[in-house]
Amino acid sequence: TVSHATAIEAALLGRMGLAELGEKTLGPLAMEHGAQLKANHTLDLCRAALMFEGIEAPRGREEMVKAALSTYSLPTALGNLANKVLLDAYTESPATWRAFCAIRSTSDFKKNTAIRPSFTTPLERVGTDGELKHGTVGEWFSEYQVDTFGKMLSIDRRDLINDDLSVFDETARALGRAAMRRVSDLVYEVLLANAGNFFSAGNGNYLTGADSALSFDGLAKAIEAMMLQRDDEGNDLDLRPATLLVPPQLQTTAKALLESEFIQQIVERTPTGNSLRRAVSVEIEPRLSNTEKFGNKASAKHWYLFASPSAVPMVVAFLEGKQTPTVEYFGLDHQANKLAVTWRVYHDFGTALVDPRAAVRSKGEA
């Protein structure tokens, strides 16, 4: 069976030209029930919400809208609609950080510790007595904390009276995109800040000088630096580079390095096979060179190499594992000075640098 609120939600999706999203999230049966309401105007859905609850619809438009927004069905449908549209925009927004950040769940807003154990002694041959020797475990750790980020979303009663749901759609989508942008902003703010000299010569993960520019030799050097990372006792960590992260200014160079079948040798000036072809995937991130937002920490020349998220170069944590924003309904009377229904949109997340051995930064210039 399809609930009254779901039928109204399906009809709203149809009215907004989002039938495909409705089919995907509610299913064909719900969309069919929505179509059966034959809603040619948003006021028809207000009337349906009142009818579902056995309330006679007032004759005046404003009175009808106000009465409908006091029912269960219409506010629930609008809230679910806001959630779906917002999350649709959120999931479609670029998130380059997912290529190299481990995802974690935290149960509170306290400081949490991201620990990456490092077994500093290899497995040893078991003797005839069957005794297994104890090894030692070292740890790389970093602290992270989840914070709350949010905004309010409102739909004025006049938009319902005027059958104008485009503002609602555009606002919800804008909030969805803004939510993902805020996560990305925080990730790259932390990455570029380089707290605790995460990228440094001492950690073997920071390349400088003219030969650190993105080139065949520069990328080969970064790959080598990561693959040569060892623990405190000299054991190889077997890290494998997975993602090359570059600003838009370096995307052509990056794609040429990783996609071309041949490269031009400088000395002989003859093409030769490209041994770096498809060595890693490439991600283009405009925040890396956004000096307006990140000041002199941003650059059009620097670039990064990361191992896979399982190696935990960085962590992004979400409260109780909820990776998407939360949408809460507040009703028509939430603000006495404003005749509008309001939703609160908020997102709880945090991020931190964790294991410097799983990342390399190249300055890209002398």
Give residue spans per PLM region.
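Intrinsically disordered, low-complexity terminal tails
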Residues: 1-72, 359-366
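A conserved ligand/cofactor-binding region detector
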Residues: 35-50, 61-68, 72-75, 79-81, ...
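Assembly/oligomerization interface modules of large self-assembling protein complexes
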Residues: 63-149
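Short amphipathic alpha-helical segments
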Residues: 149-151, 242
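Alpha-helical scaffold segments that mediate packing/assembly in large oligomeric complexes
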Residues: 151, 155-230, 275, 283-287
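A glycine-rich phosphate-binding loop feature that marks nucleotide/adenosyl-phosphate handling sites
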Residues: 192-196, 240-247
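Sequence/fold signature of self-assembling virion shell proteins
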Residues: 209-213, 217-228, 242-243, 249-366
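Short gly/pro-enriched beta-turn/loop segments at secondary-structure junctions
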Residues: 232, 237-241
